Amino acid sequence: MIQQQTRLKVADNSGAKEIMCIRVLGGSHRKWGNIGDVIVASVKSATPGGVVKKGEVVKAVIVRSVKGLRRADGSYIKFDENAAVIIKDDKNPKGTRIFGPVARELRDKEFNKILSLAPEVL
């Protein structure tokens, strides 16, 4: 469950290391986001020479969440950390690599490029 002021690890090589959620997109009074939801975030820490800089406002998709996500077969999937991938407006990632596992639910929301770059899809 990601809400405003939540800090997330960045799971790609776009240059950002940590982002803070400003808004969960999809509805005027939406409070929480989970895996596969798009958020607007501010870059809180970044590596020097990266594509994105500290203080930039970016869009990102949540790829890992500590809060469990219930699947249709009744099983749950949860991760050890909250993580996101910074995306462009066309749903493609800004970076060229994805680090760590991502959930299969991203396929339903048409983030196919992220799934193809990920080392493991759970």
Curated annotation (Swiss-Prot):
Molecular-function GO term, any one: structural constituent of ribosome
Q: Which GO terms describe its cellular component?
A: cytosolic large ribosomal subunit
A Pfam family this chain is assigned to:
Ribosomal_L14
UniProt entry tagged with the keyword Cytoplasm: no
Coiled coil regions, renumbered to chain? none
Q: What keywords is this UniProt entry annotated with?
A: Ribonucleoprotein, Ribosomal protein, RNA-binding, rRNA-binding
Concerning InterPro entries, the annotation shows: Ribosomal_uL14 (IPR000218), Ribosomal_uL14_bac-type (IPR005745), Ribosomal_uL14_CS (IPR019972), Ribosomal_uL14_sf (IPR036853)
* One Gene Ontology term from the biological process aspect of the record: translation
Task of the protein: Binds to 23S rRNA. Forms part of two intersubunit bridges in the 70S ribosome.
Xref: NCBIfam families: rplN_bact
Subunit structure, interactors included: Part of the 50S ribosomal subunit. Forms a cluster with proteins L3 and L19. In the 70S ribosome, L14 and L19 interact and together make contacts with the 16S rRNA in bridges B5 and B8.
Please give the family membership noted in the entry: Belongs to the universal ribosomal protein uL14 family.
Q: Which HAMAP family match?
A: Ribosomal_uL14
Q: What is this protein called?
A: Large ribosomal subunit protein uL14
Q: Which organism is it from?
A: Clostridium botulinum (strain Hall / ATCC 3502 / NCTC 13319 / Type A)
Gene name, Swiss-Prot/TrEMBL? rplN
